[in-house]
């Protein structure tokens, strides 16, 4: 049996907002067709809710919701996002709430103000009117057949400022018929201890209403405070794939989900597809036209890469000595990086990885290691150069000729003043040694 046995206990719902909050991140953008493909991929993975955008905020989101009506999703529910009614209008008169209905999604998520600073200084209305705005908006959407998730914006800041009023805003949403009350750390400034304490108090205050958390990464704690919220009784977690989002990003679902399943023993609908989470991460980056994070926990190429000789040696003997989970559980793999820090174990593991079997007692291995370290000292790098490593290994241990022989090379650098640019040209001449092909 695997040493990483998973025992499920409590069910947690995953709410993905990559297509809405994620697109507010710098350099993140999806086409309408791209958003549809992302929604399908998220559904295949098994998330519970997919927040598709804000109807009326831009033509792209409007087009997405039109196209989304044609989707045949197996697991997830599409959610439209918007705000409570304006202070000067009734819910049925508010054009933004009408657009939320026109999106024709089974779920609508609306946010309202919790922090009195925002109520009086941003909305410029009264505390009492804000409570009515929340209740009226939720009830209007509920009466029109929508499941409503209420996002309590700036909840933690508002609670610290005035706990009684913060709870009153949630009570207003509950009276309106919200199926979930999600507490938002909108500024991303709260610590784990604060979120733990506040979520526990809210859960105790609303024992029969599901509580969610929506956190940001401004303090580098987006994942930690999200897990803290779940630990304190929340049953829904919001976030984005790869943590994309405004400023420093949203809580990263590609880190949260494995932790919930593998470390906290929570039951998630997507647990059966956990080994696809790295593929999902790469897919989202590709669709958003952004570079992947090499060091991302669980899903990054470096997540299970061993460079130090001691680490590689220990991992070769006992896999979990330097790996906190089996990489395959999240669709990743163990990698060995060869450098001047490498020892015999590192070289042997790397050689095996590229299809070369080595004898640990081989007298050439010691000389090869010395040569490798000398080359690294002189500035050569083999960490990301598997082909160069293999060529050196073949020459050193097997007495083979290189697969090619450098005959000559020429490098020219010049400046074309008319075009105001520097032009470089490099030409090499090689002789290839090809394997003999025998007739069948």
Q: Model-flagged regions — what are they?
A:
Residues 32-45, 92-110, 114-120, 128, ...:
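Alpha/beta enzyme core
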């Amino acid at each position: 049996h695997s040493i990483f046995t998973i025992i499920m206990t409590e069910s947690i719902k995953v709410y993905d907002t990559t297509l809405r909050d994620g697109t507010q991140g710098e350099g993140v953008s999806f086409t309408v067709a791209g958003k549809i493909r992302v929604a399908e991929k998220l559904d295949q993975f098994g998330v519970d809710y997919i927040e598709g955008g804000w109807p009326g905020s831009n033509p792209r989101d409007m087009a997405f919701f039109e196209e989304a009506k044609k989707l045949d999703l197996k697991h997830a529910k599409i959610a439209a996002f918007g705000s409570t009614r304006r202070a000067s209008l009734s819910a049925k008169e508010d054009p933004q709430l009408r657009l939320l209905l026109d999106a024709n999604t089974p779920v609508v998520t609306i946010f309202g103000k919790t922090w009195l600073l925002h109520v009086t200084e941003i909305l410029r209305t009264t505390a009492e009117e804000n409570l009515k705005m929340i209740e009226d908006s939720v009830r209007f959407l509920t009466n029109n057949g929508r499941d409503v998730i209420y996002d309590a914006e700036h909840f933690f800041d508002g609670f610290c400022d005035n706990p009684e009023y913060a709870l009153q805003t949630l009570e207003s949403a509950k009276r309106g018929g919200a199926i979930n009350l999600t507490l938002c750390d909108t500024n991303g400034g709260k610590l784990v201890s604060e979120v733990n304490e506040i979520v526990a108090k809210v859960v105790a205050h609303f024992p029969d209403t599901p509580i969610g958390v929506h956190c940001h990464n401004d303090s580098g704690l987006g994942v930690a405070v999200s897990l803290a919220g779940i630990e304190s009784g929340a049953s829904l977690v919001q976030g984005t794939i790869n943590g994309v989002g405004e400023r420093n990003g949203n809580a990263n679902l590609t880190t949260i989900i494995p932790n919930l399943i593998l470390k906290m023993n929570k039951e998630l609908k997507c647990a059966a597809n956990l080994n696809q989470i790295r593929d999902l991460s790469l897919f989202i980056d590709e669709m958003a036209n952004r570079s992947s994070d090499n060091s991302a926990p669980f899903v990054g190429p470096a997540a299970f890469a061993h460079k130090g000789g001691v680490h590689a040696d220990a991992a070769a003997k006992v896999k979990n000595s330097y790996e906190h989970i089996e990489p395959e559980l999240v669709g990743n793999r163990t990698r060995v990086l060869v450098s001047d820090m490498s020892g015999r174990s590192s070289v042997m593991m790397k050689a095996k990885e590229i299809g070369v079997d080595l004898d640990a007692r081989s007298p050439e291995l010691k000389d090869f290691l010395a040569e490798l370290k000398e080359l690294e000292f002189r500035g050569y790098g083999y960490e990301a150069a598997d082909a160069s490593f293999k060529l050196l290994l073949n020459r050193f241990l097997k007495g083979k000729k290189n697969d090619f022989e450098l005959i000559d090379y020429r490098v020219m650098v010049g400046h074309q003043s008319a075009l105001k640019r520097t032009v470089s040209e490099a030409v090499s001449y090689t002789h290839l040694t090809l394997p003999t092909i025998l007739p069948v």
